[in-house]
Amino acid sequence: MSAKRRLFTSESVTEGHPDKICDQISDAILDAILEKDPNARVACETSVTTGLVLVSGEITTSTYVDIPRIVRDTVREIGYTRAKYGFDADTCAVLTSIDEQSPDIAMGVDRALEAREGQMTDEEIEAIGAGDQGLMFGFACNETEELMPMPISLAHRLARRLAEVRKTDVLPYLRPDGKTQVTIEYDENGKPVRVDTIVVSAQHHPEITQEQIQRDIKEQVIKPVVPAELLDENTKYFINPTGRFVIGGPQGDAGLTGRKIIVDTYGGYARHGGGAFSGKDPTKVDRSAAYAARYVAKNIVAAGLADKCEVQLAYAIGVARPVSISIDTFGTGKVSEDILIEVVRNNFDLRPAGIIKMLDLRRPIYKQTAAYGHFGRTDIDLPWERTDKAALLKEQALALADK
């Protein structure tokens, strides 16, 4: 590899990874509540270990949901259905400890919340402040069709394929836990040119040989997913490199909601504000503003205004308008970043209630995002992945640049 070339690595995990089990449980509970009470306030945290699920947090709602049933259904759907996995949907204990949202926090967010989003006036949108301070990033680049960095895109596809071959009995000896990692080589112009390294760790039945696992994963998981032109004789494969992965899931490691924030976003390729997504209703800007920032960045790149774009939004608790909007195109912008910020302000309502209205976020759409990434998804329809504002942004930005 020449000195000007570089390597970049991102990882993903399967839905059976302990931390991802927690994310899916938290978002399944959120979806069940939003389905009956779209204005509910939810901050739901989950912890799992051998034979135990603990659900805690702050939930303020007018409805009732059966949390233990939702937990068991989610665990069963993931595939933990046998006691010998060390974690089983039917026999695990489920403990809950739920409080209401602090009135001190609610005070800054509550006003006008009873209004339906479709009928909210600008004054009502202005009255709903951010649920917390914080900074959020959104990113897009033209490395893949879905405008995501290639390392995380391929890592997610491999992780999804691992679950698919398990659930469809193509590789029936696989168990739910698993991880993937992809290293991409970039040329001197920053373009991805080849896959340098692939790492796959897949939980399995104890009687299967490592030779069979390695052969099967290469043929049934890697080859169907990774474009052949990116693989060459120098690509390195590490498949279950410890030699054995029988004990996994919550029996192997305890899990917590919100511990896979880099897997959830851009695989480390872009910056992260630190806030997790799962279990949080859309008044939490940790989630909704990160989605809005991706929406902005993706439309800028889709418009051809930059090859790569990172958007930062920042908020103060109880204040509706973002305290700052920052855009970095890493030298790839076709117009200045000041112009981009101006057209973004003109075309995106980045107040919390404005984001909720713009992206229609008071719906039960979150559990499907809780594994395999919140961004760049081609298998599900997510509002922040639309590029419906690209043409308008391009027209306005080029008009400003000509002035």
UniProtKB/Swiss-Prot annotation:
- Keywords on this record? ATP-binding, Cytoplasm, Magnesium, Metal-binding, Nucleotide-binding, One-carbon metabolism, Potassium, Transferase
Tell me the PANTHER family matching this sequence. S-ADENOSYLMETHIONINE SYNTHETASE
Q: In which pathway does it act?
A: Amino-acid biosynthesis; S-adenosyl-L-methionine biosynthesis; S-adenosyl-L-methionine from L-methionine: step 1/1
Species this chain originates from: Geobacillus kaustophilus (strain HTA426)
Cofactor binding note = Binds 2 divalent ions per subunit. Binds 1 potassium ion per subunit.
Residues binding Mg(2+) are D19
Q: Region labeled Flexible loop — which residues?
A: 101-111
- UniProt cross-references to CDD domains, sorted A to Z: S-AdoMet_synt
Reactions that this protein is recorded to catalyse: L-methionine + ATP + H2O = S-adenosyl-L-methionine + phosphate + diphosphate
Instruction: Identify the EC number(s).
Output: 2.5.1.6
Chief location of this protein within or outside the cell? cytoplasm
Name recorded for this polypeptide: S-adenosylmethionine synthase
Q: Name one GO cellular component term.
A: cytoplasm
Q: Which Pfam families match?
A: S-AdoMet_synt_C, S-AdoMet_synt_M, S-AdoMet_synt_N
Q: Which GO terms describe its biological process?
A: one-carbon metabolic process; S-adenosylmethionine biosynthetic process
The UniProt family comment states: Belongs to the AdoMet synthase family.
Q: What does this protein do?
A: Catalyzes the formation of S-adenosylmethionine (AdoMet) from methionine and ATP. The overall synthetic reaction is composed of two sequential steps, AdoMet formation and the subsequent tripolyphosphate hydrolysis which occurs prior to release of AdoMet from the enzyme.
Q: Where does L-methionine bind?
A: E58, Q101, D253, K284
The GO molecular function terms of this record are:
ATP binding; magnesium ion binding; methionine adenosyltransferase activity
> Where found in the cell?
Cytoplasm
Subunit (UniProt) = Homotetramer; dimer of dimers.
Which residues form each disulfide bond in the chain?
Answer: none
Binding site residues for ATP = H17, D177, G178, K179, R244, F245, D253, R259, K260, A276, K280
